[in-house]
């Protein structure tokens, strides 16, 4: 193996390691949100991080304010009512010490008004209801060899241009890289 082969292999391995670390960061969001883990949330956002939930819901700036979302009484009630965040597999666009991640997020909850139904070998359930589906855009920065969230934007999938544009941007970055 030549030095250039080794350097190329090392560069490719670094990309794989970065993507795995980012997948883990993104995959940690649903369990942290669904358990109200403010400490965990604080550990993954930058001090001046931004949490943007679009034009119809409030957001937050700063790690303490973002972490406080998971401690709100309304969020705690949603958890007790069967809240679950279900994330789709993310597209990751790496650019040195920055990355943009684009994915979907479904917010589902136990359907307390649903009729109980039996599924063989899985018991009875009233089922779940999809409350909202959003486009989820994460802007990440590597700090001290660790990926951190600088900004997170959530826009509802409602057919309007802003969420479609977030999806196009995420897909476009991947398309350009693979061209």
Protein language model features and the residues they cover:
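Short, surface-exposed loop/helix-turn segments at secondary-structure junctions
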Residues: 113-125, 167
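Short, low-complexity N-terminal intrinsically disordered segments enriched in polar/charged residues
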Residues: 1-31, 35, 43
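Short, hydrophobic/aromatic alpha-helical segments in well-folded domains
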Residues: 25-28, 40, 44, 88, ...
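Short, P/G- and charge-enriched loop/turn segments at secondary-structure junctions
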Residues: 76-80, 121-128
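Short, glycine/acidic-rich beta->alpha junctions
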Residues: 21, 82-84, 131-132
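Short beta-strand edge/turn micro-motifs at domain boundaries
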Residues: 98-102, 124-128, 133-166
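Acidic/histidine-enriched, glycine/proline-rich intrinsically disordered or flexible terminal extensions
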Residues: 162-179
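A solvent-exposed, acidic/Ser-Thr-rich amphipathic alpha-helical stretch
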Residues: 38-111, 116
């Amino acid at each position: 193996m030549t030095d250039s082969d080794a350097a190329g292999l090392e560069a490719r391995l670094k990309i794989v390691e970065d993507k795995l670390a980012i997948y883990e960061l993104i995959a940690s969001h649903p369990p942290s949100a669904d358990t109200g883990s403010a400490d965990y949330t604080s550990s993954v956002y930058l001090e001046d991080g931004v949490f943007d939930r679009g034009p119809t819901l409030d957001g937050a700036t700063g790690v303490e304010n973002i972490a406080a979302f998971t401690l709100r009484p309304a969020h705690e009630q949603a958890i007790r009512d069967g809240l679950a965040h279900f994330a789709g597999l993310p597209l990751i666009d790496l650019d040195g010490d920055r990355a943009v991640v684009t994915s979907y997020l479904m917010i589902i909850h136990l359907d307390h008004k649903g009729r109980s139904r039996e599924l063989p070998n899985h018991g009875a359930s009233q089922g779940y209801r999809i409350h909202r589906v959003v486009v989820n855009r994460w802007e990440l920065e590597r700090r001290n060899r660790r990926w951190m969230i600088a900004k997170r934007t959530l826009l509802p999938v409602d057919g309007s241009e802003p969420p479609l544009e977030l999806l196009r941007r995420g897909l476009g970055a991947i398309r350009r890289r693979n061209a």
